[in-house]
Amino acid sequence: MSNTLIVYYSHSGNTRKMAKIITEQLHADCLEIIPQKSYPQAYSAVVNQAKHEISQNYQPDIKDIQIDLNKYSTIFIGSPNWWSTIAPPILTFIMQNQNHLINKEVIPFCTHGGGGFGHIPQDIKKLCSQSKILTGLASYDSTASNTDIHKWLTKINIL
């Protein structure tokens, strides 16, 4: 049993790819956050919906999580960068599980189309104020290689 969990939401597959690499390198458990209602696939439609949801601090319903978060001491949280912050399904996950994140190492990672991390690390630090937030990694689309991720995990003393 691993004491590390990789939690992520992915719309286009980029964040999923990054999450899978982290999972494989750490031999960790992995949990995909899935919204009850899928986002549109058309780029302009998802951009407009995400912008509206984020401006309203909206927390969409997500599918039930069948995992005991208490057994993990380290939790990676991955999201696409949507309007410089986490995707709403990840906000829902964090808000529903704040008590289970207390005193844990929380490590953000994201994929983006040019906006870098935006303010994702600061947002996660604010939402997980009683957690130890470690340095995250932002990847353009899904360009983070196995080597890039290995170097990052080594740098933050996870490997």
Where are these regions (language model features)?
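Solvent-exposed loop/turn segments at secondary-structure junctions
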Residues: 12, 37, 82-84, 113-116, ...
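N-terminal beta1-alpha1-beta2 submodule of the flavodoxin-like/Rossmannoid cofactor-binding fold
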Residues: 1-75, 84-87, 92-96, 102, ...
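Redox-cofactor binding/interface segments in oxidoreductases and associated redox assembly factors
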Residues: 77-78, 108
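Generic anion/oxyanion-binding catalytic loop in active/binding sites
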Residues: 4, 79, 138
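Short, glycine-/small-residue-rich phosphate/pyrophosphate-handling segment
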Residues: 107-144
